[in-house]
Design a protein with these regions (language model features):
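ATPase nucleotide-binding head domains, primarily ABC-like/P-loop NTPase cores
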Residues: 29-32, 224, 294, 305, ...
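Active-site phosphate-binding and catalytic loops of NTP-dependent enzymes
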Residues: 81, 104-113, 245, 384-387, ...
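Amphipathic heptad-repeat alpha-helical coiled-coil/stalk segments that mediate oligomerization
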Residues: 198-206, 213, 261-262, 368-443, ...
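C-terminal tails and terminal domains of large nucleic-acid-associated
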Residues: 837, 841-879
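Extended active-site and interfacial segments that coordinate phosphate-rich ligands
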Residues: 32-51, 136-163, 484-515, 595-605, ...
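Alpha-helical heptad-repeat coiled-coil segments that mediate oligomerization/polymerization in large
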Residues: 528, 532-539
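Hydrophobic alpha-helical segments characteristic of transmembrane helices
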Residues: 337-340, 346, 364-367, 543-552, ...
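Charged catalytic and DNA/RNA-contacting regions of genome-maintenance
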Residues: 1-325, 341, 345-354, 358-450, ...
């Protein structure tokens, strides 16, 4: 046995080997030490022919799933080596084989997975300058493939799918991509596979064979060279780990990244699409607001909608039409919710069925779900529109499968397939016959008691007992003190220290009656159950199509319900480039606040004179909430959802970028400012004129002059249609940036309205035209509870600093790329020289002369502020 264990372990070196021995899975040597430590199990030893005992630990086979899941969540792979023949029939050592390898991306245990989230396994192939990306969820049978031509686009797909496991070729692993970040920060198990997985010659053959097509054209893969290799490698990996035909993976869906709105990882995090930034909880996210789904399939589909909004107007309008229909038919909508509620996870149930791991109770759950389908299809007849028609066409009520299960499986069966009592009476004649024999078994059991009494009386052995174990069956046990009274017709079966065990012809006959019929009945029920399960598995394509239709209905019913409950409006979708939101509200914040009413606000952006809105105002006033709500309303509209507003006219955007807040990235050694600049650089490099940018406090992570210079230059760059020209909401504390409204045609100033009451302020949360006249920082500090002594000192200091404001100097900065009429060159006597010092005037003639020589009309904003910074340092150094 140990020799076979070592041979098997050699084949699965990278796995923890669960080796079945009787009623336990045992681990040996280093595996035992690892499992003992990770799962806090007792480490024992076993004699294995070596000088020292082999370290060993084990878990009961009936509880193994829980232990396996804990190991997989810690990043381990687990190979399950099972007994594949009946130990009673084995000649010599019981035959064992690895029946499955469980990895983070191939785990199909429904108890350990989040039912509302897909469990994706991704394969990445890097060849030349392209990345092939194949992604599957083995629990649902979904299989996608695409290609991208940059690392940034690859990371966008990575963030969109959020896989739990990545397999890749060696060139990708060594390409410089931050593998450690994927493993540690993102929690993804990443491994490079041997080169044979990625052979070009076998790739095409693998795909054609699995999907039963004659050419790659039949799969839509003509232009996916890297994608073909990635898809084939992923299938090979699944064959190796799952040890089955993968009959639940029936369709490969190529897609172009241009089909969906692009949202990078930072923006997903900042907008809190599916989880909150700090707590990583669903509550408080956009998904939390929208998700009123009743099924696991619907919850997963809605999540995918939120993570990949559409950019195709026609597809968006199809979704809108169905939501409108469901809104208008409230009774139909509520009846659909009633019938959707009892439906189990059909996608994952059919995978368990095809993997032959579904138990009798899974089959009853499946049957109960199928009973809900006919009334749902009847209700679908009331819905109009192209999308509703398409759903109806793919909606199969599966009555034949439901009838099979109702006639064959007991309503309350055991979990184990080996416990019997699975098959209904009347389904199979032989089962019925053997069940009738069971009545005789009960009588036979009474006969055992009768036989025991009769033998005691006949032999005079008062402590004679009839007992049973799996090895010897039924036997008569007599203690040594009475063995001299044993009659000749007793046949000895076993000698113990203090007793003898015997068999008689009459007892043997009873044993055959009892055990033979029970074993035959259990075995027959097991065989029939497998046949029924296989019949269901043969219909996997029908079941998956219906499961997807159910998921779609669930999603649109949910979106319609949310729209009605929250007074959302139907947005107008177009390609005009205009975003015009009246009375917009933040979908999450309005649900979270309890005592206050949410203040709505308007947003207007276009591709001409209203391209950039510069928003000023104090902290806590609501700038970030306003900008996020605008982005979320656009995103919701492109999901197809209704939106929280009085009205909305949404010109489709291809990307949403946000740069909202930052913190030090200590793990990678990056400061707050470096994190901020990396995000800004990504936006400026990858945004287009059709993108929506949400920028909050650009430049705050460095000195005032540097920060203002960068913020100014960024606004200039974005506003220039030849460079970018994207629609932008730009919040800032640099009030000097409001000067750009008069210098750049596409820039407009807005601020958060504030009401002053003496030294106190009230945030009105309303966006109004114009720039803020001051920041109210001291008032905000007072609201936050800063000690009064500090507040009073701050007032003194701000009064001194206000005399040395740089605003007047900023007014005279030229704007890059503007007509000469926009530039202003001040006379020397117009310049307030006190601005060059924070607390006193400047009397140094050489500095004044240097200032006279500066030609402001030929300086960029960055040059001007750098010069100002240089002169200020000279003054400081002389004090």
């Amino acid at each position: 046995m140990m020799q076979h264990y070592l041979q098997t372990k050699e084949e699965y070196k990278d796995c923890i080997l669960f080796y079945r021995l009787g009623d336990f899975y045992e681990m040996f040597f280093e595996d035992a030490k690892t499992v003992s430590k990770e799962l806090e199990l007792t480490l024992t030893g076993k004699s294995c022919g070596l000088e020292e005992r082999a370290p060993m630990c084990g878990v009961p086979f009936h509880a193994a799933d829980g232990y396996i899941n804990r190991l997989v969540k810690k990043g381990y792979k687990v190979a399950i080596c099972e007994q594949v023949e009946d130990p009673k029939l084995a000649k010599g050592i019981v035959k064992r084989e690895v029946i499955r390898v469980v990895t983070p991306g191939t785990n199909i245990d429904m108890q350990s997975l989040d039912e509302a989230k897909n469990n994706y396994l991704m394969c990445i192939v890097y060849i030349g300058d392209k990345y092939g990306i194949a992604t599957t969820d083995v629990t649902t049978g979904d299989f996608f493939v695409t290609e991208v031509d940059s690392e940034r686009k690859l990371l966008d797909e990575l963030n969109r799918f959020s896989p739990t496991e990545i397999i890749c070729n060696e060139p990708f692993y060594m390409s410089g991509v931050d593998i450690d970040d994927m493993k540690e920060r993102m929690g993804i198990a990443v491994s490079a596979l041997d080169s044979w997985y990625f052979g070009d010659d076998l790739a095409k053959e693998t795909l054609l064979s699995h999907f039963h097509v004659q050419s790659l054209e039949g799969l839509g893969l003509m232009d996916y060279d890297c994608g073909v290799i990635a898809s084939a490698a992923l299938l090979k990996y699944l064959y190796e780990t799952q040890k089955n035909t993968l009959s639940n993976i029936l369709e490969l869906r190529p897609y172009s990244i241009g089909k969906y709105m692009i949202i990078d990882s930072s923006s997903r995090r900042n907008l809190e699409l599916v989880e909150t930034m700090r707590e990583k909880q669903k509550r408080g996210s956009l998904l939390w607001v929208l998700d009123k789904t009743k099924t696991a399939m619907g919850a997963r589909l809605l999540r995918s909608y939120v993570e990949q909004p559409l950019i195709d107007k026609t597809e968006i309008l199809k979704r809108q039409e169905l939501i409108t229909n469901l809104n208008d038919q409230e009774i139909t909508r509520e009846e659909l919710r009633e019938y959707l509620g009892p439906i189990y996870d059909l996608e994952r149930l059919i995978t368990r069925i095809t993997y032959q791991t579904a138990n009798p109770r899974d089959m009853i759950a499946f049957c109960n779900s199928l009973e809900m389908l006919p009334p749902i299809k009847t209700l679908l007849e009331d819905l109009k529109g192209e999308l509703a028609t398409g759903i109806r066409e793919h909606f199969d009520c599966l009555e034949d499968l439901c009838a099979l299960l109702k006639s064959s499986i007991n309503d309350d069966p055991p979990i184990s397939v080996r416990d019997g009592n699975i098959i209904k009476t009347g389904y199979n004649e032989e089962v019925d016959r053997l069940r009738n024999v069971s009545i005789c078994i009960i009588r036979a059991s009474k006969s055992l008691a009768d036989l025991e009494g009769k033998e005691r009386e006949k032999t005079g052995i008062k402590n004679l007992r009839i007992k049973y174990n799996k090895v010897f069956g039924y036997y008569l046990e007599v203690t040594n003190s009475f063995k001299d009274q044993v009659p000749d017709y007793y046949v000895r079966k076993q000698t113990l220290t203090n007793a003898e065990r015997y068999i008689t012809p009459e007892l043997k006959e009873l044993e055959d009656t009892i055990l033979g019929s029970q074993d035959r009945l259990v075995e027959l029920e097991y065989d029939l159950f497998r046949q029924i399960r296989d019949t269901i598995a043969d219909n996997v394509a029908r079941i998956q199509a219906t499961a997807r239709a159910v998921a779609q209905i669930d999603v649109f019913v949910s979106l319609a319900l949310v729209a009605g409950q929250n007074n959302y409006c139907k947005p107008k979708i177009n390609e005009s480039g205009v975003i015009d939101i009246k009375g917009g509200r933040h979908p999450v914040v309005e649900k979270m606040i309890v005592n206050d009413m949410f203040i709505d606000n308007d947003t207007y952006l276009d591709n001409h004179n209203n391209r950039i809105s510069i928003i000023t105002g104090p902290n806590m006033a609501g700038k970030s909430t306003y900008m996020r709500q605008s982005a979320l309303i656009v995103l919701m509209a492109q999901i197809g959802s209704f939106v929280p507003a009085e009205s909305a006219n949404i010109g489709i955007v291809d990307r949403i970028f946000t740069r909202v807040g930052a913190s030090d990235d200590l793990a990678s050694g990056q400061s707050t400012f470096m994190v901020e600049m990396n995000e800004v650089a990504n936006i400026l490099r990858n945004a287009t004129a059709n993108s929506l940018l949400i920028l909050d406090e650009i430049g705050r992570g460095t000195s005032t002059f540097d920060g203002l210079s960068i913020a100014w230059a960024v606004v200039e760059y974005i506003s220039n249609p030849k460079l970018l020209g994207a629609k932008t909401l730009f919040a800032t504390h640099y009030h000097e940036l409001t000067e750009l409204e008069g210098k750049l045609n596409s820039v407009n100033n807005y601020c958060i309205a504030v009401k002053e009451k003496g030294d106190d302020i009230v945030f009105l949360r309303k966006i109004v035209k114009g720039g803020a006249d001051k920041s109210y920082g001291i008032q905000v500090a007072k609201l936050a509870g800063i000690p009064e002594l500090v507040i009073n000192r701050a007032k003194d200091i701000v009064n001194q600093l206000s005399a040395n404001d740089i605003t007047e100097t900023v007014k005279n900065i030229s704007v890059e790329g503007q007509a000469s009429g926009k530039k202003k060159k001040p006379h020397l006597d117009e310049v307030d020289l006190t601005q060059m010092s924070l607390f006193d005037t400047v009397k140094d003639d050489d500095i004044i002369q240097e200032l006279r020589d500066v030609d402001i009309s030929h300086m960029t904003p960055m040059d001007a502020l750098n010069k100002l910074y240089e002169l200020q340092n000279k003054v400081k150094n002389r004090w």
